[in-house]
Amino acid sequence: MRILVSNDDGYNAPGLEALVEALSGLGELTVVAPETNHSGASNSLTLNRPLTVRTAANGFIYVNGTPSDCVHVALTGLMDARPDLVVSGINNGANMGDDTLYSGTVAAASEGYLFGIPSIAFSLIEKGWQHIESAARAARQVVERQIAQPLAAPVLLNVNIPNRRYEDMKGYAVTRLGKRHPSEPVVRTTTPYGDTVYWVGPVGLAADATPGTDFHATAQGQVSVTPLRLDLTQHSQLDDVRNWAEPLCVNA
């Protein structure tokens, strides 16, 4: 079993170290992670400059690029053999609902998924690392289950873990994505040089946390497991759009 491990918080993040330690013994681990924090990088690839690859003292490989860069470089340039599984995390904070569109953690797993490799993203739902060992233990359980009984391809799982002791978790729930309210307004400030700059505001609160969602499950103390796909087509709207577009004419 060959497992590629990445994240978006950077190669020296506690969540990555905890995940690697938790997965030790399950197979041959290769760690390729960003040099610095790339939270919110989504699926971006670096196309305007070359990427450098270095190895840290602990053996982790780090790239001066995005999470997607890391997995892409690992799969197409660094690894001698194709991995059986790609895992990402453990993220410092939730990746639920709309977060998945922006998340570098989910993006690293998505890159593996695009290559046809089963991929799993792990996140601890609150900032800080108070119960990172518990989150790592839950992550190992999910990986062990995938190894023991692999899901039919394609596989892209988004796992969000409550920030509590492992003994206080209320099991696992398979969920759909919830939805957040829009982010808070940008924060405008002035630099010491008199320039006006803007910081993106905090994420919005949950707008859809009804039963069956990732928000609801984690609020109940459950580990949320959400199967994702990358097909963004609104299939239910195809017929409506065909009818709407019928009068359009290139030569009109």
From Swiss-Prot:
Cofactor needs: a divalent metal cation
Entry keyword set: Cytoplasm, Hydrolase, Metal-binding, Nucleotide-binding
GO cellular component: cytoplasm
E.C. number(s) listed in UniProt: 3.1.3.5
Top-level EC class: hydrolase
InterPro entries, sorted: SurE (IPR030048), SurE-like_Pase/nucleotidase (IPR002828), SurE-like_sf (IPR036523)
Predominant location: cytoplasm
Reaction(s) this enzyme catalyzes, per UniProt: a ribonucleoside 5'-phosphate + H2O = a ribonucleoside + phosphate
Presence of keyword Hydrolase: yes
GO function terms (MF aspect): 3'-nucleotidase activity; 5'-nucleotidase activity; exopolyphosphatase activity; metal ion binding; nucleotide binding
Cross-referenced Pfam families: SurE (PF01975)
Compartment(s) where it occurs, according to its Swiss-Prot or TrEMBL record: Cytoplasm
Lineage: superkingdom: Bacteria
Sequence positions that bind a divalent metal cation: D8, D9, S39, N91
Co-factor: note: Binds 1 divalent metal cation per subunit.
Functional summary from the UniProt entry: Nucleotidase that shows phosphatase activity on nucleoside 5'-monophosphates.
Similarity annotation: Belongs to the SurE nucleotidase family.
This protein's name: 5'-nucleotidase SurE
